[in-house]
């Protein structure tokens, strides 16, 4: 039985060589609160929660080789995927396949976290994870949240992710047909996709000639922030502030 009754945009995941290197920015600057985490085969992960419920996951490679090692070797630190919790993994995969997507990495071996993925070559330049969360059981491993920071400032609000896509039709098919979001036009003509009950949304700028993929994590704050102008030198990701 899934723990969710509708599709929810759950978190944005960033790949990093060392999870601890995220703490000075995510906690000391953005006020992120350690939430959950676990080792998971060839990587370990930890999530930070922000005002309103937005979540950022940091993934650190473990061992000599694996998919995350390859990602970091080819691209460096940066946004790796977005995760959507779904009531039924089977139904989510069927919707995506009906819309023309290939399902990769489907794994239903863990009743607490059944998952499958869309490849970035088909999915607007980003890995998309479907996850059906189930209730914990007697053999559940304890959560190990990432390192926090005593005395961290109040958390900012993570508004969501801004992306670039080459086609309105493909963006709408991906985020509404396959993932059941709703779409509206943003103030600068971008497509804004949202999910009822989700604290974050996706904004997609349409440009038929530019490469598809993530542009920036968008956030809002009631206090003054010090954000780098370009990609963060450690997290390899642009963080862009919006008005509250």
Question: At which residue positions do the language-model features occur?
Answer:
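Short acidic/glycine-enriched loop/turn segments that link adjacent beta-strands
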Residues: 40-44, 78, 110-114
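Donor-sugar nucleotide-binding helix/loop cap in glycosyltransferases
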Residues: 72
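Amphipathic alpha-helical segments
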Residues: 19-33, 90-99, 167-182
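Conserved hydrophobic/aromatic beta-strand scaffold that supports enzyme active sites
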Residues: 45-47, 83, 115-117
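An N-terminus-focused feature that recognizes amino-terminal "leader" regions
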Residues: 2-61
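Vicinal oxygen chelate
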Residues: 2-3, 56, 93-160, 184-210, ...
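N-terminal beta-strand motif that seeds the catalytic metal site of vicinal oxygen chelate
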Residues: 1-23, 77-84, 133-173, 217
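Long, hydrophobic/aromatic-enriched structural stretches that serve as scaffold segments
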Residues: 56-67, 76-87
């Amino acid at each position: 039985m899934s723990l969710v009754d509708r599709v929810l945009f759950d978190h944005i995941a960033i790949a990093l060589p060392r999870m601890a290197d995220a703490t000075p920015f995510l906690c000391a600057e953005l006020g992120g609160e350690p939430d959950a985490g676990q080792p998971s085969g060839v990587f370990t992960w930890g999530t930070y929660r922000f005002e309103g419920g937005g979540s950022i996951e940091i993934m650190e490679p473990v061992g000599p080789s694996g998919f995350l090692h390859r990602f970091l070797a080819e691209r460096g630190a940066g946004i790796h995927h977005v995760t959507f919790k779904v009531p039924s993994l089977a139904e989510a995969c069927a919707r995506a396949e009906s819309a023309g997507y290939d399902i990769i990495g489907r794994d239903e071996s863990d009743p607490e976290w059944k998952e499958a993925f869309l490849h970035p070559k088909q999915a607007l330049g980003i890995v998309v994870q479907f996850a059906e969360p189930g209730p914990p059981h007697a053999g559940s491993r304890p959560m190990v949240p990432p390192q926090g920071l005593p005395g961290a400032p109040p958390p900012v609000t993570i508004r969501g992710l801004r992306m670039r896509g080459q086609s309105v039709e493909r963006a709408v098919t991906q985020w509404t047909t396959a993932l059941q979001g709703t779409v509206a036009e943003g103030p600068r003509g971008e497509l804004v996709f949202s999910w009822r009950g989700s604290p974050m949304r996706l904004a997609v700028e349409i440009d038929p000639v530019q490469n598809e993929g993530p542009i920036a994590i968008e956030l809002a704050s009631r206090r003054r922030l010090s954000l780098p102008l370009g990609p963060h030198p450690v997290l390899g990701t642009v963080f862009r502030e919006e008005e509250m």
